[in-house]
Amino acid sequence: MKIGKFVIEGNAAIMGILNVTPDSFSDGGSYTTVQKALDHVEQMIADGAKIIDVGGESTRPGCQFVSATDEIDRVVPVIKAIKENYDILISIDTYKTETARAALEAGADILNDVWAGLYDGQMFALAAEYDAPIILMHNQDEEVYQEVTQDVCDFLGNRAQAALDAGVPKNNIWIDPGFGFAKSVQQNTELLKRLDRVCQLGYPVLFGISRKRVVDALLGGNTKAKERDGATAALSAYALGKGCQIVRVHDVKANQDIVAVLSQLM
């Protein structure tokens, strides 16, 4: 499997989540020192992660805005330390070009933008400048849709075209339907049922639903975030069967066997 100029063995891969934030919904405050972050990265790599997604600002509903300066202070030391110690691809989870540039200079390989270039109009130019793969996620301000799957597909197609127009090569563009972002439980569920339509847009698809509220709802409600890893793994299997190629998860080990087996059947 290729992500731009990068090659990953197999037809599917796990992206391990590393939140260096104090307020992420699942593991906020757990990895706020470089050493704690490195220890977690080492475990995720041992468990089978092929990409580490580093985030310095929580994007959960109601989260506090973080300036680019503070975000850079959080992520750059961690990215540098990971690159110094491990041979692993790193994505930077940010929608700010200033942070993204600093992360790329520090050694990050991939951009992961939860606003698909809408928040910062220079993100696509930056991706083109660095020949960096970019993940474009569906997002919007309100949970209002004519038909959620079609609207998500239209959005992703339009944003991918905007990236192409800005000089990003097609093989550097990945898409993410944005589960948990501006979508009700019902809308998330509807999108899950029609995930194959997203996978037919002509771009590789990242699946990110790990521990989110819709997983809790599918389990009947009242579960804690870390109690959702088994269901997350089941949904990873479902997504890979629908055509997704990367699953973004908190618990790498719980997903590794599924990805290893299904990767050989894709």
Swiss-Prot record:
Q: Which PROSITE patterns match?
A: DHPS_1, DHPS_2, PTERIN_BINDING
Question: Which Gene Ontology terms cover its molecular function?
Answer: dihydropteroate synthase activity; metal ion binding
Transferase: present as a keyword of the record? yes
CC terms in the record's Gene Ontology section: cytosol
One of the protein's GO biological processes: tetrahydrofolate biosynthetic process
Write down the InterPro entries for this protein, in alphabetical order: DHP_synth-like, DHP_synth_dom, Dihydropteroate_synth-like_sf, Pterin-binding_dom
Enzyme Commission code: 2.5.1.15
Q: Which SUPFAM superfamilies match?
A: Dihydropteroate synthetase-like
Q: In which pathway does it act?
A: Cofactor biosynthesis; tetrahydrofolate biosynthesis; 7,8-dihydrofolate from 2-amino-4-hydroxy-6-hydroxymethyl-7,8-dihydropteridine diphosphate and 4-aminobenzoate: step 1/2
Q: Which Pfam families match?
A: Pterin_bind (PF00809)
Q: Which CDD domains match?
A: DHPS
Name its co-factor(s): Mg(2+)
User: Per the record's keyword annotation, is Transferase included, yes or no?
Assistant: yes
What sequence ranges are listed for the domain Pterin-binding? 12-260
> What residues does Mg(2+) bind to?
N19
What catalytic activity is recorded?
(7,8-dihydropterin-6-yl)methyl diphosphate + 4-aminobenzoate = 7,8-dihydropteroate + diphosphate
Highest taxon of source: Bacteria
Residues binding (7,8-dihydropterin-6-yl)methyl diphosphate are: T59, D93, N112, D176, K212, R248, V249, H250
Q: Which UniProt keywords apply?
A: Folate biosynthesis, Magnesium, Metal-binding, Transferase
Q: What does this protein do?
A: Catalyzes the condensation of para-aminobenzoate (pABA) with 6-hydroxymethyl-7,8-dihydropterin diphosphate (DHPt-PP) to form 7,8-dihydropteroate (H2Pte), the immediate precursor of folate derivatives.
UniProt similarity note: Belongs to the DHPS family.
**How does the record describe its quaternary structure?**
Homodimer or homotrimer.
The identity of this protein, by name, is Dihydropteroate synthase
What gene is behind this protein?
folP
